[in-house]
Each structure stands twice: as structure tokens, then as C-alpha cells.
From Swiss-Prot:
Subunit structure: Interacts in vitro with GRXS14, GRXS15, GRXS16 and GRXS17, but not with GRXC5. Interacts in vivo only with GRXS14 and GRXS16.
Protein name: Protein BOLA1, chloroplastic
One Pfam family linked to the record: BolA
Keyword Transit peptide on entry: yes
Further information: The GRXS14-BOLA1 apo-heterodimer model derived from NMR data shows a domain arrangement totally different from the holo-heterodimer showing evidence for a Rieske-type ligation of a [2Fe-2S] cluster.
Keyword DNA repair carried by entry: no
Organism: Arabidopsis thaliana (Mouse-ear cress)
Taxonomic placement: Eukaryota, Viridiplantae, Streptophyta, Embryophyta, Tracheophyta
Length: 160
């Protein structure tokens, strides 16, 4: 059933720590199976469901800069190929909070729900570390808070 797998080096996930070279830091190796054709990107049809709470792109030309939610979706979709992926921008709930004063970016807080066979055999900590690893660039460039729900298809209620 699994066509290929990837090996990820997962280390140093606290967002204020700099990324360390795998040679110089302890690492955990996680094998994540790929089990869907990466070319198919259906949204909300069949067994795969992708939900977004914000606009895919800003601007109208094909070279427009994607927003943070869209970049997060692409990274998670590419590596985990989830059967369900919900990304919700809840930054508006934190506007005016002390930590947000003076910030120019407005996409800082997200809720993410991922249902993927790639999580099978992983405990909750390893699942979250994997998601943080995949979103490292976003965490380093303004993503302030991330709430993660990570499940396997057998742990998630059926949508029949």
C-alpha cells in the first residue's frame, strides 16, 4: 500500500532555538509512509478532505505571494498526504494581546487538524514534532502559535 517513504531528521523544535546540524545534535529518525499519489490534490471530494479558512493567494497574477495558511497546507499535504487537513487561522482572536502589539504580520495563530496514515505507529509527541519540523520555516518567520490535532484514520470518527 505504501509507495515510498521519507526519512526526516527531527530535532530542536522549540521555535526560539536555532536549527542545529544533524551532525552536532541528537536526532530522532522517523519514517513517514507516502500512500497517496502526490499529484492528486482534490479538495473535499472522495476520501480526502482539505479545508482552509483563509484565501489561497493574495493578488490576482500567477506570481502572487501565497499566504501562510496556503504555504502550511502545501507543506503538510506534500509530506503527510492526509485524508483530512483543516487549517484555521485564529489570529483575529489574539489581536491586541500584549505579544501581538507592534507586529506587522497578521497570520500568527493557527489551529491544525491532520488525519494521516503517516502518523501510524507514532505517539503524540512524535506526531507533533513532525508537524513542527515540517512547519519550521513558518515558525521562524512569524508563526507564533500552533494548536495541533493529529490522528490516524482509525482514530478519527468516520464521515459516512
Amino acid at each position: 500500500m505504501f509507495s515510498s517513504s521519507i526519512r526526516l531528521i527531527v530535532s530542536g523544535f522549540h521555535r526560539t532555538q536555532p536549527l542545529k546540524s544533524p551532525v552536532n545534535s541528537p536526532s530522532v529518525f522517523i519514517s513517514v509512509p507516502k500512500f497517496f499519489n502526490s499529484e492528486s490534490k482534490s479538495t473535499g471530494t472522495g476520501s480526502r478532505s482539505v479545508a482552509m479558512s483563509s484565501v489561497e493567494k493574495t493578488g490576482s497574477d500567477s506570481g502572487a505571494i501565497e499566504n501562510r495558511a496556503s504555504r502550511m497546507r502545501e507543506k503538510l499535504q506534500k509530506e503527510l498526504e492526509p485524508v483530512e487537513l483543516v487549517i484555521e487561522d485564529v489570529s483575529y482572536q489574539h489581536a491586541g494581546h500584549a505579544g501581538m502589539k507592534g507586529r506587522t504580520d497578521d497570520e500568527t495563530h493557527f489551529n491544525v487538524k491532520i488525519v494521516s496514515k503517516g502518523f501510524e505507529g507514532m505517539n503524540l509527541v512524535k506526531r507533533h514534532r513532525l508537524v513542527y519540523h515540517l512547519l519550521r520555516e513558518e515558525l521562524d518567520t512569524g508563526l507564533h502559535a500552533l494548536s495541533i490535532v493529529s490522528k490516524t484514520p482509525s482514530e478519527s470518527p468516520s464521515k459516512d
